[in-house]
Every structure is written in structure tokens, then in C-alpha cells.
Amino acid sequence: MAFMRLGSKSEAFHREGQTWLCTTGLVSDVTIEVGDMKFHLHKFPLLSRSGLLERLIEESSTDDGSGCVLSLDEIPGGGKTFELVTKFCYGVKIELTAFNVVSLRCAAEYLEMTDNYGEGNLVGMTETFLNEVFGNWTDSIKALQTCEEVIDYAEDLHIISRCVDSLAVKACADPSLFNWPVGGGKNATSGQNTEDESHLWNGISASGKMLQHTGEDWWFDDASFLSLPLFKRLITAIEARGMKLENIAMAVMYYTRKHVPLMNRQVNMDEQVIETPNPSEEDQKTCLEEIVGLLPSKKGVNPTKFLLRLLQTAMVLHASQSSRENLERRIGNQLDQAALVDLLIPNMGYSETLYDVECVLRMIEQFVSSTEQAGIVPSPCIIEEGHLVKDGADLLTPTTLVATLVDGYLAEVAPDVNLKLAKFEAIAAAIPDYARPLDDGVYHAIDVYLKAHPWITDSEREHICRLMNCQKLSLEASTHAAQNERLPLRVIVQVLFFEQLRLRTSVSGWFFVSENLDNPDNQHGANGGLLKPRGENVRERVSELEKECMNMKQELHKLVRTKRSWKNFTRKLNFKKKSECCKPKDQATPAI
């Protein structure tokens, strides 16, 4: 850590309680009060260094020559800083460091200790040392932290802006090229001037060891010790100098985890847990609301996992509505990057549902709206025998990914007995039909919901099944649906019909290929030898499809026969009851 020694005399003061006395033996002729501290001093050393003290002493002097009493309660830095100022005026040895130079510079300005009142006065000396401090990352961090104590004076003297600019330059520079002398987080605030911290401007330590850097995140920990207002100014300056938005986002995330420890309760075991203080929930809430506005606004820069965790913490802390809406909008715009487990947000409101489905619905609607405005539509695809076949571009478009995510989310929340049918349908219907190449996911979610809500009416079952397109079910899903007793009979018949139609089309196509393969005119030389095994495979496949088709026809006939038998039985039973009711009493069967 940089330092500068001023003065040459030995200690000339001693303290008695809250009073400082001079040991020179001369009687004090001026008493200066700073807060609850009293300094019994002499006029001449003060008059020769401070313009303010010169005026105050002249105004307070009496004709009888008695000592005067002055009050300097507004001096920057308080009694501790004025103690150093007093020693400087008396020529006693003091040491300027990154921890005291800012308050001394502000106090010197307040006391008007310019070179007009003696060469090498405190204003000039502290200004010279500040320029040295600004050349060093660790010292600049320490100095910026102390600005909090004298914020107004430091602002007027442009100390904060100069310090922030120097830090921004170093953070944006390549440390491997410039060898900025960086320190480690805790050492930056400990105030210990260890041997390892004694280094030159180029980063070479006094012991001959080169300071090590750990990549682009080397400055995150040091910056996290700043107060939120100063951290915001540093991030703004760094962003203005063109740092990558991804690095800025990571720095803000690091700061958030440190100052909003409630977020760390949701950290997975494989994630780094940052040691944090224990601020109040109100302080955490204030910090979170400020952080939301500090995050880069560009889509995809902030990890969706972090945004979802931040949103959940905002709900716990009852953050402002604008902050939560901001987070929901950010998450919605990049919902395709979310993981299912992170969407399972516990319900913090008055609703009876286990999860906050209203919040997720708003984010889905935001995503659909943003993609439609951008004109993003999934590439066309073909569904052949229940399997996706690519046609051109990759099918994993953002909209398709979100459709899969939403179907998985519906399957997770469907077992909640308090989840209303209307809300389930609203979430499923929020995804446009073109976003689902297959409807297997939404079918699975519907099946889970029907299983968890067996009391819903037949009309409601019919209504919820309209969310899926039976033509877009895979072969496996169709087979399951055809045997699913929870589905309405109309839906089962529809599934069987479309599956039979699909199989018939496939069989016709395979027969066409088989006939061409059997034609000897199409087999010549080596090509005939290659096509013969293929023809055998085609015949086997055709045989399998015919068997599957016959099985489905039999299942369909069984369902229809069962339904007809039940109707005939019911009709006969009703006819028998009516016949018995219509018999005359005198024709009743006599008792045996």
C-alpha cells in the first residue's frame, strides 16, 4: 500500500480522555472543539497554515488576550482527521495512506490550507499523494471506500469521479499486458500494509514476485466491498469504456449474491457460496431494487437462472411492483434459456396453488409477444410415423424450446389439486399451435391433470382434451392414448382414426416401393444386388404395419361393441321396467 510521510518532529501531543494537550510546555491560547473532542492548541502554528482558522481566531480574539474557543463540528472527517491536521501544523510526523488521504484532502480544503499559507501546505501534499493513489488499483479501491464518510466534499473536489475513472481504466485493461497491481478482496479493506502489498506501479512486488491475475473476473471481489451508490458509479463508468456486457453482468451478479444473502439460500451445492454480511431485509430489498436497474438490458446477457432466482427473492422481500415486472419482462424475452426446475416458483401470494402459475403465465405471454414482434416462426417440419423429420433449418427454435418447457411445467404443476382447469388451459393455450411439432408433451400434462382431478365433469374432460391435436401424437403417445380410460371415448376414437389413417398411408407407400422393387426391369447389375436386401426389409416393415393396423382395428371394434352392448342392455332394462309398470294389478303373477 502506498504511503507518504510528512513532518519530522516527534510526538508533541498526549490525550487525556476526550482532550488533546500539547507537551511543549507553552500555555494554550486557543481551544478548538470538534464534536466531543477538545484540542488545547496555540494560535501561531494554526494561523500560519489555515486561512479559515486565521479568520476565526481574529474574529474571536479579545482585547484582554485571553484564549479563544472555536467550534469546528463541520470539518470533514471529524476529530480523528483534525488530529492529523493539527500534527501537520505543528510539524509532527504523520503518514498519508489510502485510508486517510481523502478525508485529509477534504479537511485541508475546508480549512483553506493552500500554498498561500506556507509552501508545501496540506492541500498540495494530499493532492500529490492522491495522484499516486489513483495509479494503483488496490489503493484506489481503499480511497474510494473512504469517500463515503465525506461524500459531499469528495464530490465537490471531484475525488470520486477521478477515483472511479482510474478504476474503470484498470478494470477494462488487459491485466496480463499492463500488470495492474491488483489485490485480493479482503486485503483491500483490511488496512494492513503487508510486505506482499509493497509493489511498484507495474505490479512487481518488492520481493520480486509478479502478482497473479485470475482472468476477467479479477476485480469483482474488490468492487463488491463498495457501497451500492459507489458500485453503481463504477459499473456505469466501466460500461461507458466498452467492457463486455457479459462481464458487467457477472460483476453485478457477484455483488448481488454478497449483499442480498437471501439469494444464497437457493444456491445449489455445486455453486460457489460467497461469504456475506447480515444486512436487514429492508436493506436487501433496497439493494435488489437498485440492482435490477443496473443489470444490462441486452437480451441474453444476464443468465436466465440468475434472473429467476432474483425474481423469487424479490417476491420474498416484497420488492416493488416495477422491479418484479422488470424481471418478468427480462425473463420472458429469453424464456427459451430457462430450466424447468427454475420455473417452479413457490406461490407467495394469496392464491391456493402450490406454485405461482400467474407469474409463469405472464412470462410465457411476454415471450410469445416478443417473438411474434420479431417475426420469429419455427422452421417447417414433417411428422412421419410419429417421428420428427427435419426440413431445412434446425427444429430447436426458441419457440419450440419454450413449448417443450411449458409442457414440462404443466406436467409438474398438474398434480396440484388446487390448480383450476381454466388456469391450466390458459398456460397450455398460451403457446401457439405451430410451436409444437408433436403434442406428446401436452398430452402427458393433460393425462396427469385428469389423474389428479378425477372429479371434473365429462364436458370439462372434453374441453381440456381440445388442447391437443390428435394428428400430432407420436406412435407411442397414440398407443397410450388409445388405452387411456381417463380420456373421453370421442377422443380415443379420434386417436384411433388418425392412427389408422396414418398407418394406411404408410402401408400404401411401402406397397408402392415394394412393387417397384419386385419389378425386374428396375434391377440391373450391381444396383439389383443392393436393392434386393432393401426390398426384403421393406416387406418386413409392411408386414409389421399391417399387424399393427389390424390390432388397432380390433381395439376399435371392441370399444364400439362394448358401447353398443351397454346401450342395448340399458335399453332392455328400461323396457323391462316399463313393461312391469304397465301390467294390470289383476294380472299380476300369483304367489306360489
UniProtKB/Swiss-Prot annotation:
May act as a substrate-specific adapter of an E3 ubiquitin-protein ligase complex (CUL3-RBX1-BTB) which mediates the ubiquitination and subsequent proteasomal degradation of target proteins. PANTHER family: OS12G0117600 PROTEIN (PTHR32370). This is BTB/POZ domain-containing protein At5g03250. Pathway: Protein modification; protein ubiquitination. Residues 217-502 form the NPH3 domain. The BTB/POZ domain mediates the interaction with some component of ubiquitin ligase complexes. One of its GO terms (biological process) is protein ubiquitination. The keyword Phosphoprotein applies. Keywords: Phosphoprotein, Ubl conjugation pathway. Residues 28-98 form the BTB domain. Belongs to the NPH3 family. The modification Phosphotyrosine is found at Y443.
